[in-house]
Amino acid sequence: NNNIFQIFNEIAEANLNQSKPTVVCFSAFPNTEMQSKLNLSKIKNIRIRIITRSGNLYNENELLRLNMNEAKSIIVLNDESVVDFNIESTLLVTRKILSDVKVPVIAQFNNSENIDIFSRSDKNLLPVNNSSVMASITTQAIRNKEISEVILDFLDYDGDEIYFFPPDILAGKTFDQCKLQVMNISIFGIFTN
């Protein structure tokens, strides 16, 4: 996934106060190719230790090698090296492995069809839509999944503006349902009277 190197940079920046945090990168891509790409990448901060593992993204035994139960958080990106990659299958196996553990899982969906279903069934899942996500939002979600969208939208000075309006289509919906209704804007609050 093209976002992975930016995510590594963001993780390194977010963990400057840690002594060499470890990131495990698991992909269907061969391990030697992942190492080559890492060596050629422009990761700004070498203060993180990156371990690469290759395997089947849908196989529980192979995912168990990652020791996800001890992770601070997990990011599941769309794996472009796998033909017909199915993030839903990977998330189901991940959920099985993490059954009783409260590890935040940030998942990058290509479409929003299953975002609502997965969000309602797993409180530790933070889904992001591939068409509207930046690597920094994905990484910032590790730190605080409730406000990361808001903070980064404010910090991004690319001409975005804030509008206040009474959107009738959002009346009576939860915050999560509102976010799914309006994919081209960032909702950062709902006013109730």
Language-model segment annotations:
Residues N1-N193:
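Cytosolic regulatory regions of ion transport systems
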